[in-house]
Amino acid sequence: MAQETITYDIFPNGLGFYANCDGQHVGEITFVRVGIDKMIIDRTSVTEKYQRAHVGLNLVRCAANLARNQHRKVITMCPFAAAMFSRYPEFDDVRFLHTR
């Protein structure tokens, strides 16, 4: 059995990323921009077959890298993305911390 190749690309509207494996859509993450310095990750979904292949984590990484490049902080409304932001310190630099 050949190794499957998963690729990640940004949606044409720039508001999310999708994952493809051999031409098949296997996952996506969506977000909205808030002002000039924040973005909200609102949804991450991965087909069941690919949930253990780190597709969701890699989609979160794609969004975080975009946030870094655009000098934005990320608010995680999606439970999966929030869990990844809590679990992996690599996201600390783009995590939005609300202060009063």
Please tell me what each predicted stretch does.
Residues 15-26:
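Conserved beta-hairpin
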Residues 24-32, 40:
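Conserved beta-strand in the GNAT
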Residues 44-51:
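A short, internal acetyl-CoA/4′-phosphopantetheine-binding micro-motif in the GNAT/acyltransferase core
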Residues 64-79:
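Conserved GNAT acetyl-CoA-binding A-motif
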Residues 76-86, 90:
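Conserved beta-strand-loop-alpha-helix junction that forms the acyl-donor binding cleft
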